[in-house]
Amino acid sequence: MSPLMLRLLPLLCIIISAHFVPRPETSPSLVYEIGSTVTFHCRLNTTTNIQSVSWYNKSRLISNHEIQNMDNLSFTDDGYVFIHELNKINNLDVDSKLYFHIKHDRTTSLLKIKARSAYDATCLTCTFTVDNEKTSATSCLKLIMKPIVVLYFRYLNNFLDVTCTVTSYPKPNVVIKFLGEVYKRDIPMVRQNENGSSTVSVSFTFKRRTKLEFVGKTISCLASSWFTNQKASALVTSGEHTVQNHDEYSKEAVKGSNSDETVFTWIVPLILILIISVMVLLISMCIVAFKS
């Protein structure tokens, strides 16, 4: 290497290092239940010359921290400082915080959102601006809802009528297990709920030869949804019975399902009334026209 290159090498290293901005570290994928408070983490291994930290949902700005003067910050003995907090931006409720940890030369940005429905699953990008250069990383959120399983059975004359209803996200696979056999429908009844979850219902009837043939036998409703399995089981009695799995689930998820069911409850009778009214009107018009 020539003497000139040797003399220029330190200068080149300084120039390169001055413009090198490390890439932020973040979890590439997060999995939470619907109704949870989701925390996105974004960390940059430097605390030098940071001008701003921003979070974007696609191209929409949802959080922005601007650092005016790092020299005026006061740090604790362990080099840890909380600098900024935001609670609302662009009419969106967020909980956004920015931390510096000088001892470990690390800057961390936290963004919390409330995942109220399956439609809140998204990808967020955090962007650090350092020395007028931007560096970004993206974290994607996947939402699930553990199956809520309800098993119901009753007798209709000489038949045991069994219904298994499951609400979850993604849409669950549902089967009924009885007397050592597994029963499933190729096309079950499916209802889409307000929060994005699905309610799947499967029904079967079993003929009994004697009145007490099925009493004391175990019947189960099995549900699977995205690596999650749930079930509700009961011993068949001589009368009507309902059983539900006892796992905790989000209130938001239940609210979404119930609200959708309420809408369904009043819409169907209203449609029937309208149809009957139209038919009565048409019949009346026909009678008048015939008489005239």
Curated annotation (Swiss-Prot):
Q: What is this protein called?
A: Putative OX-2 membrane glycoprotein homolog
Q: What span is annotated as the signal peptide, if there is one? A: 1-18
Residue ranges of domain Ig-like V-type in the record? 24-136
Q: What is its main location?
A: host cell
Species per Swiss-Prot/TrEMBL record: Human herpesvirus 6B (strain Z29) (HHV-6 variant B)
Question: Mind listing the UniProt keywords for this protein, alphabetically?
Answer: Disulfide bond, Glycoprotein, Host membrane, Immunoglobulin domain, Membrane, Signal, Transmembrane, Transmembrane helix
Location of this chain's protein in the cell: Host membrane
Which Gene Ontology molecular-function terms are recorded?
Answer: cell-cell adhesion mediator activity
Q: Which domain of life is it from?
A: Viruses
Q: Enumerate the spans annotated as Ig-like C2-type domain.
A: 147-237
Transmembrane segments annotated in the record for this chain: 263-283
Q: Which residues are glycosylated?
A: 45, 57, 72, 195
The UniProt entry lists membrane topology as:
Single-pass membrane protein
Gene Ontology cellular component terms for the protein in this record: host cell membrane; membrane
Covalent S-S links between cysteines: 42-126
